[in-house]
Amino acid sequence: MPGWQNCPMTLSPSHPLMDGRTAESPLISAYRGLKPSRRPVWFMRQAGRSLPEYRKAREGTGMLESCLLPELASEITLQPVRRHDVDAGIFFSDIVIPLKLAGVGVDIVSGVGPVLESPVRTAADVAALPTLEDSALDPIREAVALTVAELGTTPLIGFAGAPFTLAAYMVEGRPSRDHMGPRSMMHADPETWQALAGWAADVSGQFLRAQIEAGASAGQLFDSWAGSLGRADYERFVAPASVRALDGVRSLGAPLVHFGTGTSEILQPMRDVGVDVVGVDYRLPLDEANRRLGGTVPLQGNIDPALLTAPWEVLEAHVRAVVEAGSAAPGHVVNLGHGVPPTTDPEVLTRIVSLIHSIEP
């Protein structure tokens, strides 16, 4: 049920989608299943450690602090757009930022990832969770506004972690290999799980809505850990929370993208939460993903990050194969099938962008 097609836009007249800046950009055209003026491409984690200018900008500043300093977050978001000529900026943030803004004790520990002061594992823990106040989102709005002012006709994509991934971090208290904690809670204590997933859905939706209202031209929901779930559990315990998160955003009318890793078997229910575009990781060819989805939505993806260090002729052949497979879908935005590895040579990404733009849309 694509969001933008069924919702009148409620954005301000000065929003980039409304004032003519981005509505006909290659990215937004492809997201809407229309023929773009050139093939759009951007990269998940394009703003990050692969760029020397990013490492310099972040010197002495922690990850979460970097996300909450509007001028720094804006500069980091803009860096790969300047360098690579990609067709979108992706807002620089972290999945756990909405938790931090709500007042949940969380930090990024080097070599580990997000770590919570107190995991959330009981009904009492969930009941004690704070509310995300609207004013807490002001640094996000400011960063988006600064970024959009610089991007001009290049759209900004808003970013939020999906409720399951947020809740999984909260139950485990840190990254996990098998996500046994949240998967067990779904069945052992479904009421507590539902309450936690609902809380996560609300903060995720608030976070994404704030970015789009402030100027982002699209939004992407990242469900990093959804691939750990079987289809039945996803549909019963996770999809309703993702619907709830997007319900707070869909009325804005901006295109919405849904991406997770290892999600080849749940692409249909991921689409059915109410998005316009489905991101596909590197494990499934795009023509097969399109077949599974019945040719109903544009796709995004799915260059294998492992090939970024391959000889150029090997990588070029792979990129061309991705473009060819993507042509089966109603629309295609080229991306990686995962985030940019920190050790990636930035020149390789620039070269991929040039190659994509040289292929007729």
Predicted segments, located by residue:
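A gly/proline- and charged-residue-enriched helix-loop-helix capping module
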Residues: 111-149, 154
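Active-site loop segments of alpha/beta catalytic cores
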Residues: 136-361
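N-terminal small/glycine-rich loop or linker at the start of catalytic domains
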Residues: 34-65, 95, 100-112, 118-122, ...
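N-terminal basic, low-complexity leaders that serve as flexible interaction/assembly modules and, when applicable
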Residues: 4-110, 346-361
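Short gly/ser-rich anion-binding loops that grip negatively charged ligand groups
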Residues: 63, 67, 130-137, 262
